Regions:
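Serine-hydrolase catalytic machinery in alpha/beta-hydrolase-like enzymes
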Residues: 2-113
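Primarily recognizes the serine-hydrolase "nucleophile elbow" in alpha/beta-hydrolase
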Residues: 103, 108-159
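C-terminal catalytic histidine-bearing segment of alpha/beta-hydrolase fold enzymes
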Residues: 178-228
């Protein structure tokens, strides 16, 4: 695997499920580490949470300032983003390598979830919906789909019905809720049925949202355990 630093947290010993969770622009893998004990997974099989750090790169919309970013954002508009497609695809490759790493450690792809906040969620969307093997689900928080054609032209048959938890703040002034709803519309056009949640918050995560994520994740893990 190419060099990537990360944080790992196991909810209990001997995990049989994995969640690969991508942070937002300018943050790092520690950003969502505190969420693990708040998800209420004590009764579930053990889960390994992997929080990778995005590479450092200049971000055009921030004056070329170098920060952790999954891809360069060239311009910000209320209803769109101009991004560096190459960087987005490179980040998808990082996620694929992390999936392969978990498979080698004994967790099959169908027990691996992808999660992400803001641009990390965009990476989760693309990585999951174009992955050639079935995955367990996607948690997409305060995010968007910046390059629709990358998904529509390469939608994986293995993940055409993947479960999706999608959440957005109604007062988000960084990634507008309109962008989140555009993503929902695109997913619907692809035949997917995301579970949509909105909260009266800005570009952040709230405790009600965390509880809803935990409820959804517990239900999805229970479904995995019940599967033949």
């Amino acid at each position: 695997m190419s060099e990537i630093t990360l944080i790992e947290v196991d909810s209990a010993a001997n995990p049989s499920v994995a969640v690969i969770w991508m942070h937002g622009l300018g943050a790092d893998g520690s950003d969502f580490e505190p969420i693990v004990p708040e998800l209420g997974l004590a009764e579930s099989p053990a889960v390994r949470f992997i929080f990778p750090n995005a590479p450092y790169r200049p971000v055009t919309c921030n004056g070329g300032y170098v920060m952790r970013a999954w891809y360069d954002i060239i311009s910000l508009e209320p209803d769109s983003r101009q991004i560096d497609e190459t960087g987005l695809l490179e980040s998808r490759e990082i996620v694929r390598q992390l999936i392969q790493r978990e498979e080698k450690r004994g967790i099959p792809s169908q027990r691996i979830f992808l999660a992400g906040f803001s641009q990390g969620g965009a990476v989760a969307y693309l990585s999951a919906l174009t992955h050639p093997e079935p995955l367990a689900g996607v948690i997409a928080l305060s995010t968007y789909i910046p390059e629709a054609k990358l998904i529509t032209e390469d939608l994986s048959a293995a993940n055409r019905h993947i479960p999706l938890f999608v959440a957005h703040g109604t007062d988000d002034d960084v990634v507008s809720i309109k962008l989140g709803r555009q993503a929902i519309a695109l997913l619907g056009q692809c035949g997917l049925k995301p579970a949509w949640h909105s909260y009266d918050i800005p570009h952040s995560v709230c405790i009600d949202e965390v509880r809803d994520i935990g409820t959804w994740l517990n239900a999805r893990i229970s479904a995995l355990e019940a599967a033949p």
